[in-house]
Structures are given as C-alpha cells and as structure tokens.
Amino acid sequence: MGGLEKKKYERGSATNYITRNKARKKLQLSLPDFRRLCILKGIYPHEPKHKKKVNKGSTAARTFYLIKDIKFLLHEPIVNKFREYKVFVRKLRKAYGKSEWNAVERLKDNKPCYKLDHIVKERYPTFIDALRDLDDALSMCFLFSTFPRTGKCHVQTIQLCRRLTVEFLHYVITARALRKVFLSIKGIYYQAEVLGQPIVWIAPYAFSHDHPTDVDYRVMATFTEFYTTLLGFVNFRLYQSLNLHYPPKLEGQAQAETKISEDTYALDSESSMEKLAALSASLARVVVPAIEEAEADEFPTDGEVTAQEEDRKKELEAQEKHKKLFEGLKFFLNREVPREALAFIIRSFGGDVSWDKSLCIGATYDVTDSCITHQIVDRPGQQTPIIGRYYVQPQWVFDCVNARLLLPVAEYFPGMQLPPHLSPFVSEKEGDYIPPEKLKLLALQRGEDPGHLEEEEEEDEDDDNEGDVAAENEEEDVEVESEEEEEEEVHLSALEQHRLEEKKPQVMAGTVKLEDKQRLAQEEESEAKRLAIMMMKKREKYLYQKIMFGKRRKIREANKLAEKRKAHDDAVRSEKKAKRTRPV
C-alpha cells in the first residue's frame, strides 16, 4: 500500500550531507577555487551527528557540507567569473609561449574581475550585523597592513589594508569611541564602542616580519579580500554618521601646516596618505545645517525606575569624563616609543601629541614647547630634563585609559620598575582572587587612599625594632628580679584569700542570658537549608553538590594564589632588607 521501498542510506541524515569532492564536481571547480568560494560566501563544513550513516557505513575521514549550502552556491555569479579567469590564464599562458605581446596586452586589459558587494549585503542584512562581525576583519586588515612588500601577498592588498585601517582609526579618534587597551605578547588589544556595539581587535607590534612557512597565505588573502570590502562599507557608513568627508580629508589648517615639508617626506601621490597615517590632524567635516535636538519630557515615575535612571545618568557622566581623560594635556613622544599606538590612544581621549619632525610627518610642535605637560620616554638619562613637565614611561598612558583616571606618575618615572599591567578584559567575580594592585586601583577609583607606603612603613618599623632590641634587653635584665619577687607575693596572698573564702557560705548572683537574634536567625536559616537539601531529588542533589564543589574549588584556588602572592612579597621584602643591611 505504501510507496516504493527506499534503499539504505537514501533517507534521513544521509541525504542532508555531501562530501567535498562531490560538491566540487557538482560546481565544476578546482579545490582552491572551491575553498575560495566557500570562504567568500561563509559556507563551512559540518560534522554529522551520525558520521557512519552519512558516510554509507565507512569510517574514513571525509569533509562534509550541507547539501542545501551547495545548492545555494550553484546560483552564485562569481562561479562563472572563476571559470572565465581559468580561461583567461590559459589564453595568457599561450600568448606568452608564442611571444604575441599585443595579445598579452589585450588580454590583460580584458582581465575578468568581480565585486563582492552583493555578498556583503547578503551576509549582513543590517549595519549592526556587520559591526558585530567586524572583530576578525579588523584584526586581519591590521595584520596585512604591517606586512613587508614581498612575494607572499600583493602590494595592492597591503596598501588597501593600510588605508582602511587608518580610516577606521580616524573614526575612533573623532567619535572618542576607544574604551580599553591591553599590551600582550601577541600585540595590542583595543576595544572600541561603535554605535553601542563593543568591537575588539588586535594590532601587531611594528617589528620586522619573518614569514612562517607553515601558513597558507592564499587562504588568508581570500579572507582579507572579503574583509577589505566589508571594512570599506563600514567606514563609509561610519563617516556618514559623523558628517565626515569620505574618502577622508584633513582640515585646511592641518594641510597648510604640513605643506612646507611635503616634498621632504613623500611624493605627491603618497603625501596625503602619510599625513592621514600620522593621526595628528583632525578630519574635515561636511557642512550641514545644525538641528536642535528635542529634549525628552520627564514624567513622574516610580522609585525603582528613578533609581535606574540615576544610575544610568551616573554611568553616562563617567563615560563622558572618560572620553575627556587627556583633554588639556600636551604630549611629546620620544623616538624609542611606539608612535602610532600612543598617538592613537592620546588623541582618542582628547590630548594633543607630537614628535620629532625627523621621525615622521605630522609633527605639530617641537620638544622645546613650554606647554608640553608629559614627555613619553623609554630610555632613562638620554635627555636633559626640562622643568614643568612629567617624564613617564609609555605604560602610564595605557594604564590611565584602563583605570579611567590619571594615575600618579611617581611609579612610571624613567628607570623605575613598572607596576604590573593589569588586563581590563578580566572582571573578577565573588570569590575570585583579586591582586593587591587591582585593589589599589579600585580604591583610587573610589577616591580613597590606596596606601602605597604600607611596605615602606613596615620596613621602617623593622629597622626601628632592630635598633631598640639592645636597649630593651638591658632594661629587661634589671626588671626580671623585681618582677619575680612581686609574683611570689601575689601568689601567696591569692592562696590565703581562697582558703578563707572556702569556709564561708556563698550565694552566687544569677546571670541574665541575652538571646543573640542574629545567631538565632543564622541557625534557623542553616536548618532550613539543611532540610531543603534533604528534600531534594537525587538528580537535583547531585547538581547542587557539583555547584558547591565548584565554589569550594574556586575558593581553594583563590587562597592558593593569595598564599603565593604573600610568599612572593615576603621574599621581595627580605631581599630589599638584605640589600639595605649589606655593607657597601
């Protein structure tokens, strides 16, 4: 009565997947082109739940794709472009072999090319979706922008990545969107808040590159090809939101100031890019009519809503204060410090920054300027100090941004041992170990005295105690004899008094026992908790025990870290003490 009986592996999960080779043959593409197409379209392999069924009983290692994804790729117009490019390469190779140079030039002029605009719109229907997926795009573009001009990747790709990243940095500076910075072994982590979306990316340090051989640069270049298109769309929309020219243009005043030294630093074709990359000048805005923002009406609300609004207002005020952290301060960067990272951070928080004119284009004032408040140095004793400015190490700038306030500069003077650089991306929960430096920072944020001089006071007390030991020993020898005599007299009198009191009948006064309400409440709560645990089901009790075991383990780990830190501090303190007492 039913339909035709289907054979094995022709229904169920076996029909939902297709192997990579079958998919490649269906699309009539080579393996590199198939990989490229999947990267551009965002199609990734899937691991079936029942791999043996999908693999028709075989256990061989194979890569599977969803068959609906492959059907989706069949209608992609880029597939035809890939085939046209294969024909173009074949014709070009034949023309080179026959030395037909006119045909070579004609073929190069008619080289097939394609655009990824429709793919970007397809993968990110809204602008917020694009912002949420911008982390990897920024990290990859910042990486490619630092590559040297070698045969590993095209020069045009490197230049495009450099231009797009500089444009994004200028947007962050203009919008004051930077929130957190962290120096790590891999590079510098940044976090910016763009239209309410947190975006985190990593920028590598400006070191010379030694390209590893175990990396597939073609795959990375394919990702970069898509990411550059995406970042171009995003930059255009972001510049529009701030009424900025796109492509970006410097303000007329900044262009006039740098026009004198234009021929010295770069060619006419590169000078504008060099000035933009300096990050020292502001961007020109599109003149638009000013629109007065309507103030929101305030209505009487409940107490809870009012408290939430007050907390929100305080948070916004703190955020606005954080955006103006370096406002009114003028910085000068020495040659040995990372110029681009510091210039980007300082300008993102309203500060003015400059450097030596021979170092890079875009310097706005000299080292002799009397208005300089902070000079960033990393080599102590290299310059003659100028009165009226602070000389600090670069870490001070990064720590101030993460602390949301201007930290004391005493610990960051040149030659000083720097405090630990705490990560702003770590948030301690209840029961976690909090290092003493984080506690001091929290105290500073609350406006309290963190007590930086506790260790020095303890060391001074130890020294004073050592000096007083000899004098106290002499006094103790004199007082020992008199104390022993007094103790014997007191002991004899106490025995006599006790013997007399035993002969007399005594009436002891009763004591009123006051109930400790807090202790009783705790006992009732613990008893109720014990009864609740007894009434739990077996599965619930097992889950509860796992939760409590995790909490106890976290407490043990926190205590272990605290003990290690205490042992380290004691060792450092004893080492300092030994150095101080050692004869010169």
Curated annotation (Swiss-Prot):
Post-translational modification comment from the UniProt entry: Sumoylated.
Domain BRCT span(s) in chain numbering: 321-414
Keyword Signal tagged: no
Chain intervals for the UniProt region annotation (Sufficient for nucleolar localization): 1-257
Annotated spans, Sufficient for interaction with MAP1B: 312-414
Induction (free text): Induced in malignant astrocytes following the loss of p53. Induced in hepatocytes following partial hepatectomy.
PROSITE patterns the UniProt entry points to: BRCT
SUPFAM superfamilies: BRCT domain
Segments for region (Required for 28S ribosomal RNA processing): 1-54, 535-584
Function, as annotated: Component of the PeBoW complex, which is required for maturation of 28S and 5.8S ribosomal RNAs and formation of the 60S ribosome.
Name recorded for this polypeptide: Pescadillo homolog
Species: Mus musculus (Mouse)
